[in-house]
Amino acid sequence: MSELTVVAQPYAKAAFDYARDVECLDDWQQMFAITQVVLEQPNTLLVLNDLDEDGSEQPLLDLILHAGGEWLNKNFENFLRIMEENKRLKALSEVNVQFQEMKADYERTMTVTVRVSEPLDEEQMARLKQALTEKYGKAITLETQLDPSLVGGVVITAGQTVYDGSVLTNLSRLATNLHV
């Protein structure tokens, strides 16, 4: 487990517990999404690189609050200020990831990524979604990605689990077994 994962955990839990208790999970999810977009901007990356290990994270907080503007409510701003005061703002992306996971668990939903070499038809998508719903006991959202390098088959990523049924992987295994 990385240091950022450990640092982010209590902040993600506090954010989730608060948002759940005041029934605004979707609002907080949206605000986390906005901050994530800000964090991924080149200007933000420059600010992140300039922060000292023991220095203030105020420049990063200012940038996030300015860019987030009216999209961030006062409670979320206060949450960010607490993270900054504790010099934990660098973990905000990981807090976002953990918050999203907690929200999905709470709502019994799961997003599953499906990589395919060619598009699946409606019936295949429905059968796959049904099988995953039965396996995980959650409402499933499928995100499909076309990846011609797979040659054929499918690679399914559900949480931390990867099911690789691609032709490419099977050919690689065969080559390994034949010592080619």
From Swiss-Prot:
Instruction: Recall the GO molecular function terms of this protein's record.
Output: proton-transporting ATP synthase activity, rotational mechanism
Tell me if ATP-binding is a UniProt keyword of this record: no
What Gene Ontology terms describe where this protein resides (cellular component)?
plasma membrane; proton-transporting ATP synthase complex
Quote the InterPro entries the UniProt record gives.
ATP_synth_OSCP/delta_N_sf, ATPase_OSCP/dsu
Assembly notes: F-type ATPases have 2 components, F(1) - the catalytic core - and F(0) - the membrane proton channel. F(1) has five subunits: alpha(3), beta(3), gamma(1), delta(1), epsilon(1). F(0) has three main subunits: a(1), b(2) and c(10-14). The alpha and beta chains form an alternating ring which encloses part of the gamma chain. F(1) is attached to F(0) by a central stalk formed by the gamma and epsilon chains, while a peripheral stalk is formed by the delta and b chains.
Annotated NCBIfam families: ATP_synt_delta, PRK05758.2-2
Q: State the similarity comment.
A: Belongs to the ATPase delta chain family.
Protein name per its UniProtKB record: ATP synthase subunit delta 2
Gene responsible for this protein: atpH2
